[in-house]
């Protein structure tokens, strides 16, 4: 008699974050978060909590206010010692590179926005070489404008004595894309 090996697929645990604004009421935000939860599930993540905040508009620095970001951080710390710690926070909007970097530094987990989540799903599902190439191109197009903000912590790399100023980190990143 054969024995079957049962293996568990390890999924990441996620938190969803959305804003309630004048343009997007609470019902619409709930609908968008329901859709985002479905997308997260499709990508292999398990949603355990939703955070919403009523604001006039997103914060340019961290998308949500400092108090809400603190609430999210406290929840992540609370779940650290459990079997399934929080692995990512998914925002129901497109984040700037500055927002992503600031939020990631504050929370210490992977940060995704709706666009990057959708691109990840397409990358997972792409079958043909052509489809994989198209998804990769879309991911690069998405990343390219964010390179400048991602590498603000790095200085220009010198070109050496007599060989000019050298290339900046953004230029090196663009070349690699």
Would you name each region that the model predicts?
Residues 175-177:
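Conserved small/polar residues in nucleotide/adenosyl-binding loops
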Residues 171:
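Active-site-proximal binding-pocket segments
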Residues 106-168:
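Canonical P-loop GTPase G-domain recognition
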Residues 1-114, 118-120:
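N-terminal accessory targeting/assembly segments
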